[in-house]
């Protein structure tokens, strides 16, 4: 099987076609310009620097360009980084397309849509079900295509819906264990908690923040969407207020982006399972490329920790 980008170890030489996920111009200490690139294939992404760039390089090596690259894997502050030796733009003769380099969810969109729909059908509270169903229908195309984040966790095509499916499974297990949990409120919170990402983020390819994402953020966006759809459906019960609280508080703390801490049971559960699924996704990503008996590279989204991969099963 052909090795992919993250399969290479420090010290090994890379000779691959890769997709440029991001390209940012900088100035080195010697005053010369360089490009800071994030390069990706289906295995994940690595940072690389292209030094002493010319004006033409900025156009040739911009976002969404496919390049053929030779270089070396290095260790930079506990993380793998790619040192570029040779780089060129891919041409039509190379026969490669962007879709070949984009990581996607391990479950296809149709299966995820069927599973999420089943959870909505199980909801008994008519108001919560109608709001959830209407918002999902409004944004369903983007919901099943978008990543869950720009970086850190589920940052791949269909990552948003995969994150939701994983959380719904966790939510069901929690509700089975604790009968006092309001399943309808919890399921609605899980399905809608990151729906604002379809407005906050630019899309599944070379994802950036939109103007709304930079100025408002996905939490405020989804709460506004709930208010609008509730008005359209003439729903004004307590469910609307409590659902908005569950969504507002799902980051848990003010310093993490939530204006209110969780103050109802389902809000606390949503926060915890969101954190769990995101954390495990980040761990799985680095441990997949860590040999047994060794520590992973540092994970910025998890307090810059390195994780150990045990030798036993």
Curated annotation (Swiss-Prot):
Domain (HD): residue spans on this chain: 163-279
Record-given protein name: 3'-5' exoribonuclease YhaM
Organism ancestry:
Bacteria, Bacillati, Bacillota, Bacilli, Bacillales
Q: Does the keyword Transit peptide apply?
A: no
Which HAMAP family does UniProt cross-reference here?
3_5_Exoribonuc_YhaM
Q: Name one Pfam family in it.
A: HD
Q: What is its EC number?
A: 3.1.-.-
The family note in this entry says:
Belongs to the YhaM family.
- So what does this one do? Shows a 3'-5' exoribonuclease activity.
Q: Which residues bind DNA?
A: 22-90
Under the GO molecular function aspect, what terms does this record hold? 3'-5'-RNA exonuclease activity; DNA binding
């Amino acid at each position: 099987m052909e090795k992919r980008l993250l399969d290479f170890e420090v010290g090994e030489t890379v000779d691959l076609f890769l997709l440029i996920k991001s390209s940012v111009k900088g100035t080195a200490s010697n005053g010369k310009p360089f490009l800071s690139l994030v390069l990706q294939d289906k295995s994940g992404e690595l940072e690389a620097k292209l030094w002493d760039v010319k004006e033409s390089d900025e156009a040739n090596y911009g976002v969404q360009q496919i390049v053929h690259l030779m270089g070396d894997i290095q260790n930079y502050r506990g993380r793998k980084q790619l040192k570029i030796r040779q780089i060129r733009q891919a041409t039509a003769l190379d026969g490669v397309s962007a879709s070949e380099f984009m990581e996607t969810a391990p479950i296809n969109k149709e299966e995820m849509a069927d599973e999420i729909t089943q959870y909505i059908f199980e909801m008994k509270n008519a108001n919560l079900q109608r709001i959830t169903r209407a918002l999902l229908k409004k944004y369903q195309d983007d919901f099943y295509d978008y990543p869950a984040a720009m970086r850190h966790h589920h940052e791949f095509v269909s990552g948003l819906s995969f994150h939701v499916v994983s959380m719904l499974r966790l939510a069901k297990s929690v509700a089975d264990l604790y009968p006092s949990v309001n399943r309808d409120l919890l399921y609605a919170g899980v399905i809608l908690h990151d729906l604002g990402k379809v407005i906050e983020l630019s899309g599944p390819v070379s994802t950036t923040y939109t103007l709304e994402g930079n100025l408002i953020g996905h939490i405020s966006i989804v709460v506004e969407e709930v208010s609008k759809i509730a008005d359209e459906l003439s729903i004004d019960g307590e469910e609307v207020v409590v659902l908005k609280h569950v969504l507002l508080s799902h980051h848990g703390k003010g310093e993490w982006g939530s204006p209110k801490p969780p103050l109802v049971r389902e809000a606390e559960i949503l926060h915890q399972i969101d954190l769990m699924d995101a954390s495990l996704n980040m761990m799985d990503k680095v441990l997949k490329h860590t040999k047994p008996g060794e520590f992973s590279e540092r994970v910025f989204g998890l307090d810059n920790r390195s994780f150990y991969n045990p030798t036993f099963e």
